[in-house]
Amino acid sequence: MVLSKTVSQSDVSIHSTFASRYVRTSLPRFKMPDNSIPKEAAYQIINDELMLDGNPRLNLASFVTTWMEPECDKLMMDSINKNYVDMDEYPVTTELQNRCVNMIAHLFNAPLEDGETAVGVGTVGSSEAIMLAGLAFKRKWQNKMKAQGKPCDKPNIVTGANVQVCWEKFARYFEVELKEVKLSEGYYVMDPEKAVEMVDENTICVAAILGSTLNGEFEDVKRLNDLLVEKNKETGWDTPIHVDAASGGFIAPFIYPELEWDFRLPLVKSINVSGHKYGLVYAGIGWVVWRNKDDLPDELIFHINYLGADQPTFTLNFSKGSSQVIAQYYQLIRLGYEGYKNVMENCQENASVLREGLEKTGRFNIISKEIGVPLVAFSLKDNRQHNEFEISETLRRFGWIVPAYTMPPNAQHITVLRVVIREDFSRTLAERLVRDIEKVLHELDTLPARVNAKLAVAEEQAAANGSEVHKKTDSEVQLEMITAWKKFVEEKKKKTNRVC
């Protein structure tokens, strides 16, 4: 079963205009061709199809790095054929990963003694990192419950409803109940008080988010830690905290060094961070570090020797490329603390330019906070005539990819547009985006509202039938518009290839 959708379900042929210089036969779409074709033709066919992809630099939906220095690109290409798991064959690559783990652990204030090495691993992203951290929490909790002679078959984890989907995957794949703290209008992150109220003896950990996907806001990890310390004292439990710092882990240490969210807090036992977000590496690298070796149960670590030497491993996959690990090490030594600080401050300044430009239009409410991930989340003050989904769709004509989405349960009537500010998003682009948004608003203002047009037709028909039309409330109209546009966007997505 193919989970992603394709443009056509029929096994029609693929043709390419310029590839006809090398080959005149068409290619089947879903079957391997019987014969070989020239390399020039294969390249041209694929290149022609990829032209219809969006421009990664203008993809403002993604947190993932889309630009690196040419020197780092060369290092990555030079190591693209190295399988990272062959540690005995590529010992220097393994050493570079270990250096990265230790640098990140020190960045997060891990309580390491002089000469002590950090406990952590490189992953293909924060999703795998969260799976590994969750498994460690689950196994530690199971061992504790078994030692106390208590049942250990109903673990749960407490999170906010704003968590990324990988937390839902962890809960479903590894049979852990997910207890979500609902959001509310104006408060789009987990409330520490409500989270601690949901903690019970079966809670393996509370997950705090440093940089919400929805609006970039940092959750109050220190407040959560303090409340949980008190609850643990009252109950005799030892419920720990995991910090999902996928987005904020490479931001907070450089811009908000006084903010306590990491291993300075005693209940924080593990932290994950995405190297391919604000770690400034192309997609495919994440990290998870533990407070100390006692927080990672030994029985989860495998030892293999069929690649030439005894190798401890704790991953969900086996083979993976070395390029991203090498690229992460390059960025850490190339930029250093000063360089990362400069990049993050520049991102924040560009986010401020965009925020101020949107505020000057007088048309938007800014949902994101100034302290947090450098992004701008905003919604229309008045969406009775046109909504955020229409703005998102129309902006694509200018090349911009700006997502529109609804908030999670209890705040799902709020629709938001979000622009992520990455290193390659300049002040000039921010100013240009504001101008293009103003053009879109002007264009939409000149068009009749779809809901009003439908209402006029309904009133006409009702008058002819001698009946009355029930006019919906503003909130009913808003919800109807959001639902319709959400369905429209989802249907469009089904018609194009999507990564699962």
From Swiss-Prot:
It comes from the Eukaryota. GO terms for molecular function: calmodulin binding; glutamate decarboxylase activity; pyridoxal phosphate binding. Its EC number is 4.1.1.15. One of its GO terms (biological process) is glutamate catabolic process. InterPro entries: Glutamate_decarboxylase (IPR010107), PyrdxlP-dep_de-COase (IPR002129), PyrdxlP-dep_Trfase (IPR015424), PyrdxlP-dep_Trfase_major (IPR015421). The keyword Flavoprotein does not apply. GO terms for cellular component: cytosol. The keyword Chaperone does not apply. Its cofactor is pyridoxal 5'-phosphate. It catalyses: L-glutamate + H(+) = 4-aminobutanoate + CO2. Keywords: Calmodulin-binding, Decarboxylase, Lyase, Pyridoxal phosphate. It is an enzyme of class 4 (lyase). The modification N6-(pyridoxal phosphate)lysine is found at K277. Residues 469-500 are annotated as: Calmodulin-binding. NCBIfam families: Glu-decarb-GAD. PANTHER family: GLUTAMATE DECARBOXYLASE (PTHR43321:SF36). Catalyzes the production of GABA. The calmodulin-binding is calcium-dependent and it is proposed that this may, directly or indirectly, form a calcium regulated control of GABA biosynthesis. Homodimer. Belongs to the group II decarboxylase family. This is Glutamate decarboxylase. It comes from Petunia hybrida (Petunia). The lineage of its organism: Eukaryota, Viridiplantae, Streptophyta, Embryophyta, Tracheophyta. The gene is GAD.
